């Protein structure tokens, strides 16, 4: 073990979007901050080269993990082939095969940048519809922090347009949405005849130069990497924090936490890649890892005072794991659509995000994937044995006519959807892999039956042929639950400020604290919650 003990006012574990935004806000307000991440620093140009040199078959299957090599001391998920980092069991194990990245910047290196606000009713699902759980706060309490997050991240949205249902706003989006490309425009016109409202997706992507980053130029490569940096990434906040004095330590795998007689956290220990142990002390500690790694660490760090895990007196750490179970459809449209103009996700059908039906079945988001079809078209045309002019013509035809649509569903928190430490798999440092048991439940299955018909209606309206629909639920990497919030320490892990009930100086700035999944991407809500937690931390340390 190293003889040196590191120290700071605040130690943050996890340098993804939540941890980095939190670090920047705290250091900007005069606190000393140490920001740790299990993974390495990553270089954008190298990621681009990794993507360029990937096998075509990986690209056609939307392999977004391989450009980010997993390191032995901090493995993350990769399914090409499956590295068995995340073990998933249960009837819907396909629905929880999450894609995560470890490293400074986190998984926002490869996201679509969709930055939705949740609806007011998402915060009071149980009070309104009698199902699920309520958040420990209202939408109105989080609204100022939503705007703070939007400004930090540079979110563009449909200023001046009316969207139903929508989240009330006190201020306009920092930037106005880019215009649709041909594919989204055509899709919008067609589904409007079905009574569906296809509206612009708020995105953390620049429609004009913003905060030192360039305007999006439509590379359509947001996943796995924006080559020019127009799309927001948690690494930007990490760099800002570092310039103001925060210290970033990559390749730091936290494995233990010490507590005193009052059960306050007094120190944490981390391994470096050589398995040398290092100790860190602070006044306040924050775990800002993703919704898988946060409960995993809390369980791993069990000690004599907390034999079932840190912050786990309720036995809810690792329970209520959520995402947005998805179903997808692909087909060839009768008329050219030419997906690929602009970013990968420009629009979404919002009609089914809220309503009285939520007392019986899940709300949904239906969307059009604007990812260019040429890679998939090329692989399909080659599999048909075509050569020469016929091959070229078939690739062009499929690229023009290929359509991908999807339906994502909210899922209710269920304590049986649980993460535990694997007894069978360990990484190079001897740390157990996470293991999740997952069942989406009848609430989702009932909704999915309706969604499948809606997708079929869209395909029919577009003259679809070669229709393929996923027969199982797919993940969306919107990891929520696992350390759920609430007022009562007996049935929740954190309070409305993300402070753990068991440890007064430990906060969890992560999507794992979210009490309901809603229907849309969770990143903006995670960011807003983290920025709100920063105010609680600042107030604590100001009072001494």
Curated annotation (Swiss-Prot):
Biotechnology: This enzyme is commonly used in a number of research projects to examine the electrochemical properties of enzyme-catalyzed electrode reactions, named bioelectrocatalysis. Available as a commercial product from Sigma Aldrich (catalog number F4892).
Class of the enzyme per the UniProt entry, highest EC level: oxidoreductase
Keyword terms: Cell membrane, FAD, Flavoprotein, Membrane, Oxidoreductase
Keyword Oxidoreductase: yes
Residues annotated as the enzyme's active site: 478
SUPFAM superfamilies: FAD-linked reductases, C-terminal domain, FAD/NAD(P)-binding domain
One term of GO molecular function: flavin adenine dinucleotide binding
Cofactors required: FAD
Enzyme Commission number(s): 1.1.5.14
Alphabetized Pfam families for the sequence: GMC_oxred_C, GMC_oxred_N, NAD_binding_8
Cellular compartment(s): Cell membrane
GO CC aspect terms: plasma membrane
UniProt-listed GO biological process terms: fructose metabolic process
Domain of life: Bacteria
Binding site for FAD: 14-30
Reaction it catalyzes: keto-D-fructose + a ubiquinone = 5-dehydro-D-fructose + a ubiquinol
InterPro entries: FAD/NAD-bd_sf, GMC_OxRdtase_N, GMC_OxRtase_C, P2Ox-like
Activity-pH dependence: Optimum pH is 4.0.
Main location as per UniProt: membrane
Subunit structure: Heterotrimer composed of FdhL, FdhS and FdhC.
Function: Catalytic subunit of fructose dehydrogenase, an enzyme that catalyzes the oxidation of D-fructose to produce 5-keto-D-fructose.
Family of this protein: Belongs to the GMC oxidoreductase family.
The protein's name in its UniProt record: Fructose dehydrogenase large subunit
Organism the protein comes from: Gluconobacter japonicus
């Amino acid at each position: 073990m190293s003889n040196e003990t590191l120290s700071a006012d605040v130690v943050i574990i996890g340098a993804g979007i939540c941890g980095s935004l939190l670090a920047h806000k705290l250091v900007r307000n005069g606190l000393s901050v140490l920001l740790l991440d299990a993974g390495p620093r990553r270089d954008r140009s190298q990621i681009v080269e990794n993507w360029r040199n990937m096998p075509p078959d990986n690209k056609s299957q939307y392999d977004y993990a391989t450009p980010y090599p997993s390191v032995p001391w901090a493995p993350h998920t990769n399914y090409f082939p499956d590295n068995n980092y995340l073990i998933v069991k249960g009837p819907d194990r396909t629905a929880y095969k999450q894609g995560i990245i470890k490293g400074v910047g986190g998984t926002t290196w490869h996201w679509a940048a969709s930055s939705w606000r949740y609806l007011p009713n998402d915060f009071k699902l149980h009070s309104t519809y009698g199902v699920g759980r309520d958040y420990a706060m209202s939408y109105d309490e989080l609204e100022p922090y939503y705007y703070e997050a939007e400004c930090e991240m540079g979110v563009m949205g449909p200023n001046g347009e009316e969207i139903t249902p929508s989240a009330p706003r006190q201020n306009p989006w920092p930037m106005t949405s880019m215009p649709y490309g041909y594919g989204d425009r055509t899709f919008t016109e067609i589904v409007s005849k079905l009574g569906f409202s296809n509206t612009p997706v708020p995105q953390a992507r620049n429609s004009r130069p913003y905060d030192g980053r360039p305007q999006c130029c439509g590379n359509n490569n947001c996943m796995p990497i924006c080559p020019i940096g127009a799309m927001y990434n948690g690494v930007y906040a990490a760099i800002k924090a570092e310039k103001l004095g925060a210290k970033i330590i990559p390749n730091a795998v936290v494995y233990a936490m010490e507590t005193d007689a009052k059960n306050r956290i007094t120190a944490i220990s981390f391994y470096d890649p050589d398995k040398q142990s290092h100790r860190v002390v602070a006044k306040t500690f924050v775990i800002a890892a993703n919704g898988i790694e946060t409960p995993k660490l809390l369980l791993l760090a069990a000690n004599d005072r907390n034999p079932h895990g840190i912050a786990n007196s309720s036995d809810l750490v690792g329970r209520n794991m959520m995402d947005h179970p998805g179903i997808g459809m692909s087909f060839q449209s009768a008329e050219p659509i030419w997906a690929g103009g602009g970013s990968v996700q420009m629009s979404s059908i919002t009609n089914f995000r809220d309503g009285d039906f939520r007392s019986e079945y899940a709300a949904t988001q239906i969307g059009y994937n604007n990812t260019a079809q040429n890679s998939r078209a090329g692989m399909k045309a080659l599999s048909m044995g075509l050569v020469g002019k016929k091959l070229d013509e078939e690739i062009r035809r499929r690229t023009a006519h290929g359509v991908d649509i999807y339906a994502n569903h909210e899922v209710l928190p269920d304590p049986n959807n649980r993460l535990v430490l694997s007894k069978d798999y360990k990484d190079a440092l001897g740390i157990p892999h996470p293991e999740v048991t997952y069942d989406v439940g009848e609430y989702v299955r009932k909704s999915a039956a309706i969604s499948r018909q809606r997708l079929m209606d869209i395909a029919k309206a577009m003259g679809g042929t070669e229709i393929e629909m996923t027969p199982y639920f797919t993940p969306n990497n919107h990891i929520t639950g696992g350390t759920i919030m609430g007022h009562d320490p007996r049935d929740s892990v954190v309070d409305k400020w993300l402070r753990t009930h068991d440890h007064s100086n430990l906060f969890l700035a992560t999507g794992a604290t979210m009490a309901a999944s809603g229907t849309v991407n969770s990143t903006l809500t995670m960011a807003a919650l983290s920025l709100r937690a920063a105010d609680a931390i600042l107030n604590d340390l100001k009072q001494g």
